[in-house]
Amino acid sequence: MAQIRIHEINTRIENEVEVSKFLQEEGVLYEKWNISKLPTHLKENYSLTDENKAEILAVFSKEIADVSARRGYKAHDVISLSNSTPNLDELLINFQKEHHHTDDEVRFIVSGHGIFAIEGKDGTFFDVELDPGDLISVPENARHYFTLQDDRQVVAIRIFVTTEGWVPIY
């Protein structure tokens, strides 16, 4: 279950109902998908083959189709980051640069953890700490950045409005 940390006042929101309400008020789509249907050999697997990635997409194909139909998404893929990822530290430095996109940035966490820091409507940033089963859509034009939690590993399905993917605007 996602948790929220508001930067300026270092306040945490951990209750599921309160997290959902907070994100809805900020215009952030949040859903919880059933992660238990992921096959055991794909859980906490950060060295994915193309076949593994295709299998992950197949497992969640109904959910992907549903959110895509509701929100106009056209493409998706699977990414994996861990300490075995070449140049992970350089990638994280790049990910942590505040930016926005002209379309939604959507991620579903399959394994591991991630954090989206998002600028709220009041101008203060808040973290959305994501766990397996969490789907988030950062709204278009919302300033944000992404990083990993202390375990430094994540497998995520990325869902895009266009087949070209997101273009960051710094």
UniProtKB/Swiss-Prot annotation:
InterPro entries: ARD, ARD_bac, RmlC-like_jellyroll, RmlC_Cupin_sf. Pathway: Amino-acid biosynthesis; L-methionine biosynthesis via salvage pathway; L-methionine from S-methyl-5-thio-alpha-D-ribose 1-phosphate: step 5/6. Its EC number is 1.13.11.54, 1.13.11.53. GO terms for biological process: L-methionine salvage from methylthioadenosine; L-methionine salvage from S-adenosylmethionine. Its cofactor is Fe(2+); Ni(2+). The keyword Metal-binding applies. Keywords: Amino-acid biosynthesis, Dioxygenase, Iron, Metal-binding, Methionine biosynthesis, Nickel, Oxidoreductase. It catalyses: 1,2-dihydroxy-5-(methylsulfanyl)pent-1-en-3-one + O2 = 3-(methylsulfanyl)propanoate + CO + formate + 2 H(+); 1,2-dihydroxy-5-(methylsulfanyl)pent-1-en-3-one + O2 = 4-methylsulfanyl-2-oxobutanoate + formate + 2 H(+). The record marks 98 as: May play a role in metal incorporation in vivo. Gene3D superfamilies: Jelly Rolls. The record marks 107 as: Important to generate the dianion. Binds 1 Fe(2+) cation per monomer. The record marks 104 as: May play a role in transmitting local conformational changes. Pfam families: ARD. Ni(2+) binds at residues 99, 101, 105, 144. It is an enzyme of class 1 (oxidoreductase). Catalyzes 2 different reactions between oxygen and the acireductone 1,2-dihydroxy-3-keto-5-methylthiopentene (DHK-MTPene) depending upon the metal bound in the active site. Fe-containing acireductone dioxygenase (Fe-ARD) produces formate and 2-keto-4-methylthiobutyrate (KMTB), the alpha-ketoacid precursor of methionine in the methionine recycle pathway. Ni-containing acireductone dioxygenase (Ni-ARD) produces methylthiopropionate, carbon monoxide and formate, and does not lie on the methionine recycle pathway. Belongs to the acireductone dioxygenase (ARD) family. HAMAP family: Salvage_MtnD. Monomer. This is Acireductone dioxygenase. It comes from Bacillus thuringiensis subsp. konkukian (strain 97-27). The lineage of its organism: Bacteria, Bacillati, Bacillota, Bacilli, Bacillales.
